[in-house]
Amino acid sequence: MANIGDEKVSQLIPTLGDDKIDMIAATSVLQIRASEIRQTQINWQSYLQGQMITQRDHDFIVNLDQRGQKDLPDKNPDACADVFLNLLTHISKDHTIQYILVLIDDILSEDKSRVKIFRETKYSGNIWQPFLNLLNRQDEFVQHMTARIIAKLACWHPQLMDKSDLHFYLSWLKDQLKMNNNDYIQSVARCLQMMLRVDEYRFAFLSVDGISTLLSILASRVNFQVQYQLVFCLWVLTFNPLLAEKMNKFNAIPILADILSDSVKEKVTRIVLAVFRNLIEKPQDQQVAKEHCIAMVQCKVLKQLSILEQKRSDDEDIMNDVEFLNERLQASVQDLSSFDQYATEVKSGRLEWSPVHKSAKFWRENAARLNERGQELLRTLVHLLEKSHDPVVLAVACYDVGEYVRHYPRGKHIIEQLGGKQRVMYLLSHDDPNVRYEALLAVQKLMVHNWEYLGKQLEKEQIDKQAGTVVGAKA
């Protein structure tokens, strides 16, 4: 996607969010159900007779709903907000609540400026509360149509949503994303696409562990539409420089690189490239931007860019981003030291037997550098020993721990403090023979104190072994 300044993002995203995405939403579960509910009729008179609503509320809703007075909300905004909030508070029947919510959503969709009817009302209570209460209802349509309305009220008015209400709402959306087989997941993602265009809401989403949730779902298999929507959310988040700098701490680049590699839909490719571009352009700390470039190289993004270059898409945004990324990643490769390469590989969590691991020169020159930034790389290695299920990753991590101990005088003590020795010993009984072998070597290195003495002993054993072979041959 072509480079878009932060000042323009608020103009771009509403268009993408409201027009193009609503065309997709028309076939979503929420919209199909909403179109069915519009065809029903509510007997408002029965609610009046049962004294569940007032005469004023009855007359207003009948004039709006049954007598076609569509301009009523604009003519009498205070009454409109008051009536709808009263109805949501005093009526309990799911079917009627569904209908009221569809009416409210239609009113807002017809004219965005109508959000001020609810946001600037003289309603005595907290206007968010009637809506937030509905998120706890059992009826799924009620929950998700309410969530859609809340997003519009929160995004289409300059006054921000209150922090406590915002925290509750974003936590609810996050939990809905994590729910297995959620038929309304497109609607949930749609709400986030709207909310995350507001900078203050982006940080609130970070505080409820939202970014890691997005990425954990993207790391699993989801359909391409949800994939697009969730990557879109990441794209919006990366317009904030601080969030762009944090993004790869959540392992975003490897996950997005996998999506790019597997993508068969052009719009998914386009949005992933746009995120990658922001991860390079938006961070104010150029060291972070450099690390992002190296991480992309490590995750084989250059190969995918080459494939896209050969395909020559008609999409100008894609080709612009391919050209930009190619240029920046190629430049980062030229400046890449062996330690940069190693550090990026460790941070990616995708260890493989690349040349640096087996290079004695590398370990002599760089073992001490594993202590930099609060022993960040060592901590990552120990974390991989504990959490990874990939035998190659485990074997390489064991080897690296052993080489660090071998080449850094206080290495044994530091690894023990970080819990690395215990993890390596645990892997002595791993199912994979290569993991067991590398774990055994690492344990031996952890146990030995005098490397010079060990080297001489190994050399002596080798000489004795060769001498024995010669004597045996003569005999």
Curated annotation (Swiss-Prot):
Disulfide pairings: none
Example of a GO MF term: proton-transporting ATPase activity, rotational mechanism
Gene3D superfamilies: Leucine-rich Repeat Variant (1.25.10.10), V-type ATPase, subunit H, C-terminal domain (1.25.40.150)
GO cellular component, one term: vacuolar proton-transporting V-type ATPase, V1 domain
Keyword annotations from UniProtKB, A to Z: Hydrogen ion transport, Ion transport, Transport
One Pfam family hit: V-ATPase_H_N
Alphabetized InterPro entries for the sequence: ARM-like, ARM-type_fold, ATPase_V1-cplx_hsu, ATPase_V1-cplx_hsu_C, ATPase_V1-cplx_hsu_C_sf
Function according to Swiss-Prot or TrEMBL: Subunit of the V1 complex of vacuolar(H+)-ATPase (V-ATPase), a multisubunit enzyme composed of a peripheral complex (V1) that hydrolyzes ATP and a membrane integral complex (V0) that translocates protons. V-ATPase is responsible for acidifying and maintaining the pH of intracellular compartments and in some cell types, is targeted to the plasma membrane, where it is responsible for acidifying the extracellular environment. Subunit H is essential for V-ATPase activity, but not for the assembly of the complex.
Family recorded in the similarity comment: Belongs to the V-ATPase H subunit family.
Subunit comment: V-ATPase is a heteromultimeric enzyme made up of two complexes: the ATP-hydrolytic V1 complex and the proton translocation V0 complex. The V1 complex consists of three catalytic AB heterodimers that form a heterohexamer, three peripheral stalks each consisting of EG heterodimers, one central rotor including subunits D and F, and the regulatory subunits C and H. The proton translocation complex V0 consists of the proton transport subunit a, a ring of proteolipid subunits c9c'', rotary subunit d, subunits e and f, and the accessory subunits VhaAC45 and ATP6AP2.
Protein name from the UniProt record: V-type proton ATPase subunit H
